[in-house]
Amino acid sequence: SRSGLANPRQPASFLFLGLSGSGKTELAKKVAGFLFNDEDMMIRVDCSELSEKYAVSKLLGTTAGYVGYDEGGFLTNQLQYKPYSVLLFDEVEKAHPDVLTVMLQMLDDGRITSGQGKTIDCSNCIVIMTSNLGAEFINSQQGSKIQESTKNLVMGAVRQHFRPEFLNRISSIVIFNKLSRKAIH
């Protein structure tokens, strides 16, 4: 950004990695509560429901000539009414590659185009994606704090799953520690 080459329309984006129940989704809720004084200012997209090829039309809406054209998509409708929000893509590794292509457009340009051809601004969102990729490495290590070797194994699993251009658009990747007994109580 010091060089002046950063895209000011690019939304802040984070990939939270860790075990199930380690607080990834809860942190996203707290971010929405902190920034917007309302945890409901979060748009949650469950990517396990977006594993089919037609899932893009669920997010963006169908194109002209298809059933439901006038209804719009879930994501585009939500972003029209809540342009300032935390956008949570839960379990992003389960999304169809076409959905990831739409997300790539959002992370790159700060906008997406609905099925009706309307441009939706995403530049004021904070995009948070959660994933359990590499969880087996975190689970098998000793202690609750993530070790450097474990971090490398987790990042290797992430690099195998996602395309480099997708990972390069993410502002920060955060690996969550295992929950300790002290943290639970």
Task: Please identify what each model-predicted range represents.
Residues 1-185:
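AAA+ P-loop NTPase nucleotide-binding core of proteostasis motors
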